[in-house]
UniProtKB/Swiss-Prot annotation:
The lineage of its organism: Viruses, Monodnaviria, Shotokuvirae, Cossaviricota, Papovaviricetes. It catalyses: Couples ATP hydrolysis with the unwinding of duplex DNA by translocating in the 3'-5' direction; ATP + H2O = ADP + phosphate + H(+). The modification N-acetylmethionine is found at residue 1. Gene3D superfamilies: 3.40.1310.20, DnaJ domain, Large T antigen, SV40, domain 3, P-loop containing nucleotide triphosphate hydrolases, Zinc finger, large T-antigen D1 domain. PROSITE patterns: DNAJ_2, SF3_HELICASE_1, T_AG_OBD, ZF_LTAG_D1. This is Large T antigen. GO terms for molecular function: ATP binding; ATP hydrolysis activity; DNA replication origin binding; helicase activity; zinc ion binding. It comes from WU polyomavirus (WUPyV). A zinc finger (T-ag D1-type) spans 284-376. Phosphorylated on both serine and threonine residues. Small t antigen inhibits the dephosphorylation by the AC form of PP2A. The modification Phosphothreonine is found at residue 139. The J domain is essential for multiple viral activities, including virion assembly, viral DNA replication, transformation and transcriptional activation. The LXCXE motif specifically binds to host pRB, RBL1, and RBL2. The keyword RNA-binding does not apply. Its cofactor is Mg(2+).
Length: 648
């Protein structure tokens, strides 16, 4: 301890710790007091910042000096350990005492001469005295540390590629390497063999240090092995690492600068001794993120929680699944068989939401790539294919066919040329010509404009937007349209026209400020929370509104205005056929597509879906003829139940 701090520094440190100088050298007590004083002097706790800085500097200096002195003592061959002190009074003790004091006498030797008494005359200095250089007061240069000293400061760099670099990990392993002093390595080699019943253990020297390598029959955390070794290395340095490549590490430690000292199996380890199950236990299946992404892509799911719920349903056994047993959905049966094993692993995963979010990102990325590489006509044809597949699952028998054809009859009662209107709208959104991209559905309340707009939105795919919100919130509302095929600005409010009972709103004013969005001539910036801005042509679509005034600057952006008028018989027939509203038949894209199949020739459809269109035309002819459909139209006109059959 006398070689650590100066006398004044030691006194100052003990005063700051609140200890008497008699406690100097009691490191555990000083450590306890140091932690206590840190809380007392800390500035955040109302302490003295200057005292805190001084205490830290002195205590850290003490720790460094103690470590340095310990290392120097280990390097000195002539230092006696306490167990080697001979018995007092024997010749061996006398020799030991003389050797012990010779070191201190050399250290305490002083070359200065005592001043002479005043009566003595000074002697004449010789030439040799004059030429003797004066003693320098500068600090002597520190001895350059060799590799043996440096080896104890860090883990060998030669082995870093074979070990785990994780600092805080709960991972369990069967291979470990311990780096410490040579003396402690001998002790730990025996203790570790006994404690962990090691399958293999070896000890290797590395300059003035040593390493112990062990293979255990059971898996352990690195912290468990490290804590066990700490019990034998209270002062000596210690590095404990988990090993990722056991044979690679052992092979490297048999070559320079390492030296094999001993091992419990003669001949050591061979490369063919190792298999994955030998080192890491039985192989465990891991969750396949790619399979989950493929599942989301096939179903077109872009909702995290919907994907999470659907995939969890696949974790049950196929034999116990009600959907599979009912054979209602062939696609579900196939997906359940393909993904049941992976879904079971997914149910045990602790990062379910993160995995689902990545799968959703894959779906969005695929959709964005398709929007760049495919024409709008091909995108719409693919959308129709999905709706036709959905029709195969939903419309299964005569009752379902009649229900959806009742919806077709209602639409033809709304507008006798509704099929021509829909066909022209589809042509407009596919061509997407600037300033000819938006239609306006205008009419009083309960005139059917929102029903038609919702069905067209479901047919083509897209999102409905609320434009009546304050202008400062529009950016995130418009961001919903990113990568969408169409949009609907629903129930836009504006300045009151002839109907004074309507409430006014700022929807028209907001649309007037979005002329670039409606024109489609230039790309606009769309943004969502937690996502970067996306530049794209804003999607075409529909604007629904009551009898509001359209600003003169906004009217040229609308390609066509479709006027709707309330019809009493439509409302009455709908009230008497509640199934259409309960099952949302009129708002479904399937109903509009069935209407096109019923009314339009096959040649009007894209070639890739014409075969399915022919199939559905034949199916409709099988379940409903022209006479029965005419009866449905008559029921709509009379305000009766559309599904009511007439007596012959």
């Amino acid at each position: 301890m006398d070689k650590t701090l100066s006398r004044n520094e030691a006194k100052e440190l003990m005063q700051l710790l609140g200890l008497d100088m008699t406690c100097w050298g009691n490191l555990p007590l000083m450590r306890t007091k140091y932690l206590s004083k840190c809380k007392e002097f800390h500035p955040d706790k109302g302490g003295n910042e200057e005292k805190m800085k001084k205490l830290n500097s002195l205590y850290l200096k003490l720790q460094e000096c103690v470590s340095t002195v310990h290392q120097l003592n280990e390097e000195e061959d002539e230092v006696w350990s306490s167990s080697q002190i001979p018995t007092y009074g024997t010749p061996d003790w006398d020799y030991w005492w003389s050797q012990f004091n010779s070191y201190w006498e050399e250290e305490l030797r002083c070359n200065e001469e005592m001043p002479k008494s005043p009566g003595e005359t000074p002697t004449k200095r010789t030439r040799e005295d004059d030429e003797e250089p004066q003693c320098s007061q500068a600090t002597p240069p520190k001895k350059k540390k060799d590799n043996a000293t440096d080896a104890s400061l860090s883990f060998p760099k030669e082995l870093e590629e074979f070990v785990s670099q994780a600092v805080f990990s709960n991972r369990t392993l069967t291979a470990f390497v311990i780096h410490t002093t040579k003396e402690k390595a001998e002790t730990l080699y025996k203790k570790l063999l006994s404690k962990f019943k090691c399958n293999f253990a070896s000890r290797h020297s590395y300059y003035n240090t040593a390493l112990v390598f062990i293979l255990t029959p059971f898996r352990h955390r690195v912290s468990a092995v490290n804590n066990f070794c700490k019990g034998y290395c209270t002062i000596s340095f210690l590095f404990c690492k988990g090993v990722n490549n056991a044979y690679g590490l052992y092979s490297r430690m048999t070559r320079d600068p390492f030296t094999l000292c001993e091992e419990n199996i003669p001949g050591g380890l061979k490369e063919n001794d190792f298999k994955a199950e030998d080192l890491y236990g039985e192989f465990k299946d891991q969750l396949n993120w790619k399979a989950l992404s493929e599942f989301a892509l096939e179903l077109g799911i872009d909702d995290v929680y919907l994907l999470l719920g659907l995939y969890l349903q696949l974790s049950i056994k196929v034999e116990e699944c009600e959907k599979c047993n009912s054979n209602e959905d062939a696609t579900h049966n196939r997906l359940h068989m393909e993904h049941q094993k992976n879904a079971l692993l997914f149910s045990d995963s602790k990062s379910q939401k993160n995995v689902c979010q990545q799968a959703i990102d894959v779906v969005i990325a695929k959709r964005r790539v398709d929007s760049l590489n495919m024409s709008r006509e091909d995108l719409l044809a693919r959308r129709f294919e999905k709706i036709l597949d959905k029709m195969d699952k939903t419309i299964k028998g005569e009752q379902d066919v009649l229900l959806y054809m009742a919806g077709v009859a209602w639409y033809l009662g709304l507008n006798g040329k509704i099929d021509e209107l829909v066909y022209r709208y589809l042509k407009v959104i596919v061509e997407n010509v600037p300033k000819k991209r938006y239609w306006v559905f205008k009419g009083p309340i309960n005139s059917g404009k929102t029903t038609v707009a919702a069905a067209l939105l479901d047919l083509c795919g897209g999102k409905a937007l609320n434009i009546n919100i304050p202008a400062d919130r529009l950016n995130f509302e418009l961001g919903v349209a990113i990568d969408q095929f169409t949009v609907v600005f629903e129930d836009v409010k504006g300045q009151v026209g002839d109907n004074k009972l309507l409430p006014s709103g700022n929807g028209m004013s907001n649309l007037d400020n979005l002329r670039d969005y409606l024109d489609g001539s230039v790309k606009v910036n769309l943004e969502k929370k937690h996502l970067n801005k996306r530049s794209q042509i804003f999607p075409p679509g529909i604007v629904t509104m009551n009898e509001y005034l359209v600003p003169a600057t906004l009217a040229p952006r609308f390609h066509k205005t479709v006027l709707f008028t309330p019809k009493r018989h439509l409302k009455e027939s709908l009230d008497k056929t509640p199934e259409l509203m309960v099952k949302r038949v009129l708002q479904s894209g399937m109903c509009i597509l069935l209407m096109l199949i019923w009314c339009r020739p096959v040649s009007d459809f894209h070639p890739c879906i014409q075969a399915k269109v022919v199939y559905w035309k034949e199916l409709l002819d099988k379940y409903i003829g022209l006479t029965e459909f005419a009866d449905m139209q008559m029921n709509v006109t009379n305000g009766c139940n559309i599904l009511e059959k007439h007596n012959a």
